[in-house]
From Swiss-Prot:
Organism, as annotated: Dichelobacter nodosus (Bacteroides nodosus)
Keyword Signal on entry: yes
PANTHER family documented for this protein: L-CYSTINE-BINDING PROTEIN TCYJ (PTHR35936:SF35), MEMBRANE-BOUND LYTIC MUREIN TRANSGLYCOSYLASE F (PTHR35936)
Classification via SMART domains: PBPb, PBPe
Main location: periplasm
GO MF terms held by the record: ligand-gated monoatomic ion channel activity
Protein name: Amino-acid-binding protein AabA
Keywords, sorted A to Z: Amino-acid transport, Periplasm, Signal, Transport
Gene: aabA
Keyword Disulfide bond among record annotations: no
Source species, domain of life: Bacteria
Family: Belongs to the bacterial solute-binding protein 3 family.
Localisation per UniProt entry: Periplasm
GO biological process, any: amino acid transport
Organism lineage string: Bacteria, Pseudomonadati, Pseudomonadota, Gammaproteobacteria, Cardiobacteriales
Length: 253
């Protein structure tokens, strides 16, 4: 994906440095999901990345004066692996903060709350995560959902079908290979509208605890964490985050 990588380097360098020809000495490598998660991050009609996280990271870069070089990966697991292995300095990729992940990474102040179990299905019997015990469930490989579904299915007859992207997880439902695709409500609900000709419906399990998205940085990198936290605090105070949330999630309560 060299085109996207080059495009975002130029865009974020300009944001961080303004009209100056000189950029900051510190260049931070950020890894993100490939833009196919409308409205979180996706390609617009001109072929340029856009969406909630795309606009937010640009605002953060501007506020914190960070020079960021972006790279996109399709597999969620590759996002965290790259950060853990030192191939990136930070990751912004619909990453929920969990105790297990906090053992490996440091996290910034959360910027978005999500319902972690949203389903795309044709099956009217699926209402909550407990209904997946005996179902064929398609999940994004490396996501937080994969392990949780496996735990639910320990006493059942269901199975997990790994998918390299959330689009492929939904495609498995469309093609009848899976009963349901599972993900966060931040990006799953849109699929029911986009592919309504396939009689898909979106269901949110509101019995589960909400989770929070945050930016992950390498363990111990308190300097970068503070820069981002300070930027997020200012963007919260001046209403930028609320404005972006209303823009991309107008029906969210």
């Amino acid at each position: 994906m060299p085109f996207l990588k080059t495009l975002f380097r130029g865009a974020l360098c300009s944001i961080a440095c303004g009209a100056s020809l000189f950029c900051a000495a510190d260049v931070y490598r950020i890894i993100r999901n490939y833009p196919e998660l409308m409205p979180v991050s996706y390609m617009d009609e001109k072929g340029s990345p856009t969406g909630f996280e795309t606009e937010l990271i640009r605002k953060i870069a501007e506020q914190a004066q960070l020079d960021l070089k972006e790279e996109f990966v399709a597999n969620f697991g590759d996002t965290l692996t790259a950060l853990e292995n030192g191939k990136a300095d930070l990751a912004m990729a619909t990453i929920s903060v969990t105790p297990a992940r906090q053992q490996i990474f440091d996290f910034t102040t959360p910027y978005f709350r999500v319902n972690p179990f949203a389903f795309i299905t044709k099956d009217d019997s699926i209402k909550t995560i407990q209904d997946l015990a005996n179902k064929k469930v398609s999940v994004w490989t490396g996501s937080n959902h994969e392990q949780k579904i496996k735990e639910i299915q320990k006493e059942g007859t269901g199975s997990v079908i790994p998918a390299k992207s959330i689009f492929l997880a939904v495609k498995a439902v469309i093609q009848g290979e899976a009963d349901v695709a599972v993900g966060d409500d931040a990006y799953m609900l849109n699929f029911a509208d986009r592919y309504k000709q396939h009689n898909l419906k979106a269901v949110i399990d509101r019995s589960t605890e909400p989770e929070s998205y945050a930016i992950a940085v390498r363990k111990g990198d308190q300097a970068l964490k503070k820069k981002i936290d300070d930027a997020l605090l200012q963007l919260k105070r001046d209403g930028t985050i609320d404005a972006l949330t209303k823009k991309w999630y107008p029906n969210r309560t």
